[in-house]
């Protein structure tokens, strides 16, 4: 665990990277320098930042990721959007995050069912109220919804039920929400165990991260730019300013 300097509001970059650097996928890759794609400047910069604990590579990283919506090194941005952007630029990271999903649509008239398949790298949760347990928020996410203005191509009936389905489960499961959710260190979905390794937070003007190394048993750390502090072993980082939760699949 190491700190990163804040350059003109780059706390959102720091929070995203400090969270990702606890991910086993990144740890394994950057522990073996020969795996780095020398033709990919994003990969090269991340490896430099990781191996040299932030003393090199950060300013170069700003330049290679900078866009109109990712003002790295110039202004505050969004940690979640940066993680999504990194998945777009790094195929191996995208592979770890991406999963198959789809919408099951059933006509309210003729009852014909169709499934529209796609893939995603995150789950955007919009819970019905603040502070509900993560599993309840997921249940709301996959609960069938009535769509009144949908028109059936077969019978022309107006109205259907739509339900989100998961086709596969990724190595890294990312949830994001602007509403506080009561999360836990262990999440079991469809018999699969996921362990929380990072919580990225935002209070309206500043980003920071809680992170731990895996497997479970390692201490949690607060990573706030250059301020890095180990938490008490009996404490769990529950924070109502959470925006991004990163879980890793435990495979026996």
Sequence positions of predicted segments:
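Exposed substrate/partner-binding surface patches
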Residues: 33-35, 117-252
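Conserved, well-structured core segments
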Residues: 2-5, 9-19, 84, 105-108, ...
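General secretory precursor processing signal
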Residues: 14, 48, 110-113, 155
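Active-site periphery "cap/insert" segments of enzyme catalytic domains
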Residues: 71-118
């Amino acid at each position: 665990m190491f700190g990163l300097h804040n350059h003109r509001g780059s706390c959102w970059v720091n929070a995203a990277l400090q969270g990702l650097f606890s991910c086993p996928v990144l740890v394994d890759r950057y522990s073996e320098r020969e795996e780095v794609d020398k033709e990919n400047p994003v990969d090269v910069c991340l490896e430099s930042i990781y191996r040299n604990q932030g003393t090199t590579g950060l300013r170069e990283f700003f330049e290679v990721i900078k866009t109109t919506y990712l003002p790295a090194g110039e202004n505050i941005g969004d940690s979640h959007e940066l993680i999504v952007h990194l998945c777009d630029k790094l195929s191996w990271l995208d592979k770890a995050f991406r999963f198959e999903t789809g919408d099951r649509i059933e006509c309210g008239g003729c009852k014909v069912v169709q499934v529209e398949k796609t893939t995603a790298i995150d789950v955007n949760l919009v819970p019905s109220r603040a502070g509900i347990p993560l599993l309840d928020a997921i249940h709301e996410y996959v609960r069938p919804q009535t769509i009144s203005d949908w028109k059936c191509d077969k019978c022309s009936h107006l109205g259907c039920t739509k339900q989100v389905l998961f086709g596969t489960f990724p190595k890294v499961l990312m949830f994001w929400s602007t509403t506080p959710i009561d999360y836990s260190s262990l999440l079991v979905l469809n018999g699969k165990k996921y362990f929380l390794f990072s919580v990225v937070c935002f209070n309206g003007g500043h980003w920071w991260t809680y992170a731990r190394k895996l497997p479970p048993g390692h201490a949690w750390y607060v990573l706030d730019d250059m301020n890095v502090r180990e938490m008490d072993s009996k404490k769990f980082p529950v924070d109502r300013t959470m925006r991004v939760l990163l879980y890793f699949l435990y495979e026996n």
